[in-house]
């Protein structure tokens, strides 16, 4: 299977400006430079960006050279949102975001060669007069108005600043084409209008022969089971920065992937081969209760983002929660759980009844007594039958944490200050 065919099979190509040319570039003997852009409008990448990262890695594996473009300039404006105007960020915030995202890419892509560029380096050098004369004259207003996101926002109001974003982003492709011999751009499907505008700008400025023609393509946006995307502005966003989203929360999310979604996620979020993915699909059909595809999916994603050691901590934490293996809990496990479970902080002691109510494992002390009497409550992996029990640091692990369990699915923490 060719690289182009593999990307299509993985649903990593939705739109393509020239499929014949893309096949030639991706599967030819000549190695190319390609890029994808990311704005620094937040201090972390999200799970949704893994689609682009996997695309990077698959194309790089063929020997092509990837460039990560960070929008140090375009982040001052922001890509038009579907519904409302973006709030402008302070320059210091953009710089901080830029530095954090740069570090994330260097960590996640540490095992390959790639380059990070900042579009502030060239866009900031263009004055207003030259911007309008050299570039503004090349953009037709009717063409820009035909773009879906612009057309939708016009009904609700759109500033000139956000309207100009398309022009600014187009400069990126033109600059990289001219100065770094970049021949291909890809991005999320919501970037198709900006990508084609960049191709159009290159065509108008440069006298291009067929064998120098650049190509643009898009990936389908990563969607949750409810149809919403994993975006920065969405509710329940899953950040790749473990200070913002616990790795265990991401692990749990993909461990709970529905059967109808798991194969699509394996294709677009992992580097597993087609044969491996098909085998996992068949295994899930034969033994759905084992959920092997979901387990491998969660493992691959956490290992890519955070490394093998943190995956092992996530796995052990899950074993302790749902299989009852207390000895597999590490201090880092509790750090993960603090950002995943309900918890209460206490000074030296608390009654079990109060703890069950305060952590919302139940809504009353009477109900708590009933649960204890029915042997439905555990401290770590030990069933509790004493309704008068007072919990203190002696019951804890690492002199700090107590794990409360209700049945097989519900857990909470007590943390000693």
UniProtKB/Swiss-Prot annotation:
A Pfam family of this chain: SYY_C-terminal
Name this protein carries in UniProt: Tyrosine--tRNA ligase
Metal-binding in keyword set: no
Keyword GTP-binding listed: no
Subunit organization: Homodimer.
Origin species: Phytoplasma mali (strain AT)
Recorded name of the encoding gene: tyrS
Enzyme class (EC, first level): ligase
Lineage of origin: Bacteria, Bacillati, Mycoplasmatota, Mollicutes, Acholeplasmatales
SUPFAM superfamilies in the cross-refs: Alpha-L RNA-binding motif, Nucleotidylyl transferase
Spans traversing the lipid bilayer: none
Cellular localisation: Cytoplasm
């Amino acid at each position: 299977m060719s690289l182009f065919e593999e990307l299509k099979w993985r649903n990593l190509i939705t739109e393509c400006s020239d499929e014949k040319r893309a096949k030639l570039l991706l599967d030819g003997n000549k190695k190319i430079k390609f890029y994808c852009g990311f704005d620094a409008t937040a201090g972390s990448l999200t799970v949704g960006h893994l689609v682009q990262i996997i695309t990077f890695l698959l194309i790089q594996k063929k020997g092509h050279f990837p460039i990560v473009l960070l929008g140090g300039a375009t982040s001052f404006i922001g890509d038009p949102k579907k519904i409302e105007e973006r709030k402008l960020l302070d320059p210091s915030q953009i710089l901080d975001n830029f530095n954090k995202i740069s570090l994330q890419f260097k960590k996640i892509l540490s095992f390959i060669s790639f380059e990070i560029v900042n579009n502030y380096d060239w866009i900031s050098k263009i004055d207003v007069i030259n911007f309008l004369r050299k570039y503004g004259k090349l953009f037709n207003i009717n063409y820009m108005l035909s773009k879906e996101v612009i057309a939708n926002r016009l009904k609700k109001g759109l500033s000139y600043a956000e309207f100009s974003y398309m022009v600014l982003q187009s400069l990126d492709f033109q600059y990289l084409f001219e100065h770094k011999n970049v021949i291909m751009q890809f991005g999320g499907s919501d970037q198709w209008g900006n990508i084609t505008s960049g191709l159009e700008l290159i065509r108008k400025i440069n006298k291009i022969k067929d064998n120098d023609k650049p190509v643009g393509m898009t990936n389908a946006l990563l969607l949750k089971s409810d149809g919403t995307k994993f975006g920065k502005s969405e509710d329940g966003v899953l950040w790749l920065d473990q200070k913002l989203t616990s790795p265990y929360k991401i692990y749990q999310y993909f461990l709970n992937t529905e059967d109808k979604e798991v194969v699509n996620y394996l294709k677009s979020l992992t580097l597993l081969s087609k044969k491996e993915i098909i085998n996992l699909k068949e295994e899930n059909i034969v033994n759905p209760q084992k959920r092997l595809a979901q387990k491998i999916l969660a493992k691959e994603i956490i290992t890519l983002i955070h490394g093998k050691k943190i995956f092992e901590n996530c796995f052990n934490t899950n074993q302790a929660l749902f299989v009852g293996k207390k000895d597999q809990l590490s201090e880092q496990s509790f750090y993960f759980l603090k950002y995943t479970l309900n918890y209460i902080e206490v000074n030296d002691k608390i009654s079990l009844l109060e703890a069950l109510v305060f952590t919302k494992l139940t809504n009353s002390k009477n109900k708590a007594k009933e649960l204890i009497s029915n042997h439905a409550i555990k401290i770590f992996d030990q069933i509790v039958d004493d309704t008068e029990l007072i919990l203190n640091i002696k019951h804890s692990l690492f002199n700090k944490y107590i794990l409360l369990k209700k049945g097989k699915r519900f857990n909470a923490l007590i943390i000693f200050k």
